[in-house]
Amino acid sequence: RMLFKQNTINLHLLLEFAEYESYIKNLKQHKTNVEAAIRSDYEDGGDVKEYVDFHLEELDASTIDNVLAGTDDSKPKEERLLSVLKLDRIGFYPGDENYAVWDYTIGREIADMLVVVNTNSAGEINYVTWES
């Protein structure tokens, strides 16, 4: 708390900034962990597998071919689609259990569905899902 021009105000920015700064300082490691969680969820037949299967069923063949262009065609289409998932956005929600929300996409112009990974403020994975 701080008295400012006759008003008492609460200052939370420093704590939120410190939390944010700590998270950002370890962003590369968090990204590695998030992407490992995506791979693990896929291999376990979880939501990421559903995301991949859904798009292979719903997208037309020419779109799939365009999305998979440049990937290793000796691998199954599922693996290739998984390999083109790219980080699109990280949303930060100070004070929330899901402090950072990582959005991955095969291309926003192709599909509005996202693979979403939620982490706490320490970068620990809370859960992996897919949503629009």
Predicted regions located by residue number:
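Acidic, proline/glycine-rich low-complexity IDRs
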Residues: 79-132
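N-terminal domain-onset segments
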Residues: 1-98
